[in-house]
Amino acid sequence: MSLDINQIALHQLIKRDEQNLELVLRDSLLEPTETVVEMVAELHRVYSAKNKAYGLFSEESELAQTLRLQRQGEEDFLAFSRAATGRLRDELAKYPFADGGFVLFCHYRYLAVEYLLVAVLSNLSSMRVNENLDINPTHYLDINHADIVARIDLTEWETNPESTRYLTFLKGRVGRKVADFFMDFLGASEGLNAKAQNRGLLQAVDDFTAEAQLDKAERQNVRQQVYSYCNEQLQAGEEIELESLSKELAGVSEVSFTKFAAEKGYELEESFPADRSTLRQLTKFAGSGGGLTINFDAMLLGERIFWDPATDTLTIKGTPPNLRDQLQRRTSGGN
């Protein structure tokens, strides 16, 4: 992985009681040793693979102001990180999920793009076997489950300040409160809505195939084509490019997909991140509620699966063998 650390700082927040988070600040930066580089590379990999929310700095953002000064050389990185950790403590203390942790600030470069990553990492206990085959306790950073993480694309921020996607953060397992916390700490407002962009793309694709008067099989083939392209972009860590997608759909209609989307006013960006859960709707129907979970390939609708909107009834012809076996055993047993 072509990742180069420029500067990295580590501090700690210790929860002493319900109201107080104690600051433990380092007096020096971390050295970018091989172990440190491996840790940052793993954090970068894990973070890049997760669904993120997008934002941009507000004009009053204190973090943005001090970061800009640091980038201009008016403040060193260690002082910036120490002051930011103090503000982080003040914001985090407002929320009941505040458990403290190790606060990481890392300025690094990956594939010619500069990033500032801010993360609160937890220390977990585990076991290890030593050279004498004794089992001893040990601790490790829980990078895979880190959910208090934000990253600023410094290159995008400085070269395209009007962008709405240079700042990203995770919403976390505890829901909106983590997102709210990061918005407050970063002094940011919500930017690009990737999920809305993906929903708009799906609607545009359906309308595009309808206007082209494709039959059912042809329309499903186009949906599969769109899904394959978008999924490839997702797996590669790349964004959906409308122009590239339009080339994939050349021949579907006399009008290009990009021209169709622009003329119909779908307000799609030229490129935007893929959202896995939304894109799945191109090839599958899924839903759950009231003790019922249903998931099936879209091509089965109208062939083996039929929906009557008047009665809201779903009819399935030919159940899966394992389900049929369970039903037969239950009914034959009289239970």
Swiss-Prot record:
GO terms for cellular component: bacterial nucleoid; cytoplasm. GO terms for molecular function: double-stranded DNA binding; single-stranded RNA binding. It comes from the Bacteria. Keywords: Cytoplasm. The keyword Acetylation does not apply. The keyword Cytoplasm applies. It holds the Pfam family NA37. It is found in: Cytoplasm, Nucleoid. InterPro entries: Nucleoid_associated_NdpA. Belongs to the YejK family. This is Nucleoid-associated protein YejK.
